[in-house]
Amino acid sequence: MPSSPLRVAVVCSSNQNRSMEAHNILSKRGFSVRSFGTGTHVKLPGPAPDKPNVYDFKTTYDQMYNDLLRKDKELYTQNGILHMLDRNKRIKPRPERFQNCKDLFDLILTCEERVYDQVVEDLNSREQETCQPVHVVNVDIQDNHEEATLGAFLICELCQCIQHTEDMENEIDELLQEFEEKSGRTFLHTVCFY
């Protein structure tokens, strides 16, 4: 088992649903975890598929909650968005962009391939300073409440297994293969360096 706790980041596009559900579950399990989005803006479903609610990453979850409450309380209660924002504001004040974070992590989990590509591209564009490895793993999770919950438990189980390895560098590939077979999902995995 690693001598220090695993430093984990979970990343989706808007730091709202998938990354926050995983953040919530991982922090309840005692992990050192942060969550992020990679998008240029935060997007939440609106009254129609072509009319999303778009916010800046500086907007707090509380401000988004109050804005949607004012716009259409019934719609955003029924589709679960207000409930999700209520959970989010109990975890942290506002969404965060991965590209603006300079903290170091041991493991970064992304929730879709496009986000994985953005995270890897960002890490590879940074100047290497410490040569400390960071494992980036993609777990494809559909962006809905049910899949976010299932995906969060899978991410949590994966983190618990990695936390208990003797040698993460040499055991992670085999571990991911076991998880692929067990879950029926395919994981992308690469190593970047800080």
From Swiss-Prot:
Enzyme Commission (EC) number: 3.1.3.16
Enzyme class: hydrolase
Catalytic activity entry: O-phospho-L-seryl-[protein] + H2O = L-seryl-[protein] + phosphate; O-phospho-L-threonyl-[protein] + H2O = L-threonyl-[protein] + phosphate
Gene Ontology molecular function: any one: RNA polymerase II CTD heptapeptide repeat phosphatase activity
Coiled coil stretches, renumbered: 160-186
An example Gene Ontology CC term for this record: cytosol
Domain of life: Eukaryota
Pfam families according to UniProt: Ssu72
Keywords: Coiled coil, Cytoplasm, Hydrolase, mRNA processing, Nucleus, Protein phosphatase
InterPro entries: RNA_pol_II_suA
GO BP annotations listed: co-transcriptional mRNA 3'-end processing, cleavage and polyadenylation pathway; termination of RNA polymerase II transcription
Record localization: Nucleus; Cytoplasm
Task performed by this protein: Protein phosphatase that catalyzes the dephosphorylation of the C-terminal domain of RNA polymerase II. Plays a role in RNA processing and termination. Plays a role in pre-mRNA polyadenylation via its interaction with SYMPK.
Subunit organization: Interacts with GTF2B (via C-terminus); this interaction is inhibited by SYMPK. Interacts with RB1. Interacts with CD226. Interacts with SYMPK.
Stated family: Belongs to the SSU72 phosphatase family.
Protein name per Swiss-Prot or TrEMBL: RNA polymerase II subunit A C-terminal domain phosphatase SSU72
Underlying gene: SSU72
